[in-house]
Amino acid sequence: MENTNLMLFVCLAAPLSMMLFIFEGKSRQILGFLFAGIFMCMFAGEINGLFLSETDYTIWFLTVNVTPVVEEILKALPVIFIAFVFKPKPQFLLEAAIMVGVGFATMENICLLFESSGNLNSLEIVSRGIGAGMMHGVSTLAVGFSMTFASSSRKLSYAGTVAALSTSIIYHSIYNMMVQSDYPILGILLPVATFIPFLLYIKRKRPA
C-alpha cells in the first residue's frame, strides 16, 4: 500500500470518525456506509494499481474493462450484505447504497486532486468531480434499487444480484469510455441524466 493513499485515507477518515461518537441510530449507520465507501476506494486503488504494474494493459483498456469490474463489485459488497442479512426497508437500503458510492467518489476525487495537482485546470477538476462523483453514486444506487426487489424473493436473489452488478459495471464502463472520447462532456452528462429518475423515484416513495 502506498503511503500517500494511506495518509489521504487517514486524513479523510479521522475527522469523520469523530461523528461516530455523536451520531446515534440510523445516522451512525449511514455514516458507517460512508466509511465503507472510502475504504473500498482505497482497496480498489491497490487492486487497480496491481493490474497496472503487473500487466501490459493500457490505461484505456484498464479503465474500460478492468476497473469498472473491480470497483463495482467492491462497492456492492456492503449493499448486498445488508440486503440479505438484515433485510432493511427499501428507503434505508437506497440511502446506504448511495452513501457507499459517495464515500468511494469522495476518496477517489481527493486522490485524483492530490496526484494531478498542477496537471489539471480548474474546469477539468470540477467536471471530473461532478461526473465521477455522480457516476459512483448512481451505479451503487442502482445496485441498492435492484436489491430492494431481489432480497424480497429467493428466486430473484441470485439472478437479481448478478443483474444489478452487471448493469452497474456496464454503466461504469460506458462512463469511462465517454470521458476519454473526443466528447467528454457526454460522460459528464450521463450520470446527471441518470440520477434525475432515481431522485424522482426516491422522493415519490419517501413517506410524507
What are the language-model segments listed below?
Residues M1-A208:
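Hydrophobic alpha-helical segments at protein termini of multi-pass membrane proteins
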